[in-house]
Amino acid sequence: MKLQRRDALRIMAACMADWWLPRQLFAQRISARKKPERRVIVVTFGGGVRYEDTMAPQGWVNIPHLASELVPQGLVYPVARHEGLTGHFNSTGALVTGTRQNVDAYGSEAPVTATIFEQFRKEHALPPEEAWVIATNKSFGLMGGSKLRAFGDPYSANVLLPKQLLIKTIKSAVSTNSGPGVEDRRALAERMMLALDEGYEGFGWRVFESERTLVPELRASLAKSLLDYFNDPAAPTSGDELTFFMTKEIMNRFAPSLLVVNFWDIDIAHYGAFSLYLDAVRRTDRLVHELWQHVQSLPAYRDRTTLMVVPEMGRDSDVAGNGFANHRSGDESCRRVWLVALGAGVPKGAGTERPIRTMDVAPTVAQILGFKMVECEGRPLPELVF
């Protein structure tokens, strides 16, 4: 009999429970630390989107929540630009450091300048739970910190790659003696691997992890979220939905002051199907809206959180580049993006044609959370109230 996906998920949950969740870990709590009053969440339309497909008037149909619900609540910068290499790791690296990056495109090298996470944690003497990168892109394992001697792993962010954590969990669960027969478990693992193999992650993509690993309490928390994922009647069906699910879990349990969330389903555009690209854009728009709703539902975040939404880069134009499917030509369409800010300190219903750069995000975060950037090309956005 063919195993249905939802039944498979429930079987996996049963296999995982004892392995992932020792009972005593439920009783443990991370000790309370003094937190900054403000919170910042940066969300990227990872993979890159073209201005014409999103923030241009003809693209509003693809971002209905941003265009009609979130932009009126905040401030939009329609003229933003990504400067530097138009690959995923380097473009997001520039976003979190405020400086152009030129490291391995597949994530084997950390940023060469200090990230906002390191500088935030070091200046305020904060624990790792206060800064997170949650990314669908599996090459972002080293995005949480640089290798600078004065910073690095002791001050890095926790980096969570939800798809990879789930894959490891599945592999470990099916290797145990409990649960269904060995052949059934192998077949189930193969089905789950296929279900999770979304986005443009072919040969050459590897996971490079930081030297610092999650403490047991954090691992237990994430395992609980995975079990919820398996048992949810509306179980997520894409990498970005899983990333969103895990982001909510981190917010609920630890209320970190600084979060960078990388949605990346949009990079399916590399397969050349415009309809799949637009579906991913609309899904990202929906998830951003749902994330903002979740912010409003939590006392730790409501009225004290600034949300910034920005594409990590654009994509090629049809004329000067290789079309929506790529982002390596470096043409203007690859660089023209936008930024939407809302929440604490952001004027409502505003907009400015003043050109900005994605590198301006990092020093803006620094101003909001009250720390200094030691090296930065970007400039804080003066329209926001610090």
PLM regions: where:
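N-terminal secretory signal peptides and thylakoid transit peptides that target proteins
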Residues: M1-M16
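Substrate-binding rim/cap in mid-to-C-terminal beta-strand-loop elements of soluble/periplasmic
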Residues: N90-G98, R328-L369
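Active-site-proximal N-terminal segment of extracellular/periplasmic enzymes that hydrolyze or transfer
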Residues: W19-Q73
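Short, structured active-site-proximal loop/turn typified by the sulfatase FGly-forming signature C/S-X-P-X-R
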Residues: D53-H88, E130-W132, T352
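A contiguous, mid-domain pocket- or channel-lining segment that forms the substrate-recognition surface
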Residues: Y106-R219, G239
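Non-catalytic, well-ordered alpha-helical segments in soluble enzyme domains
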Residues: F117-H124, R354-P382
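Active-site His/acidic residue clusters
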Residues: Y51, P57, G145-K147, A220-N231, ...
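Metal-dependent active-site segment of extracytoplasmic phospho-/sulfohydrolases and closely related
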Residues: V40-V42, R283-A325, V365
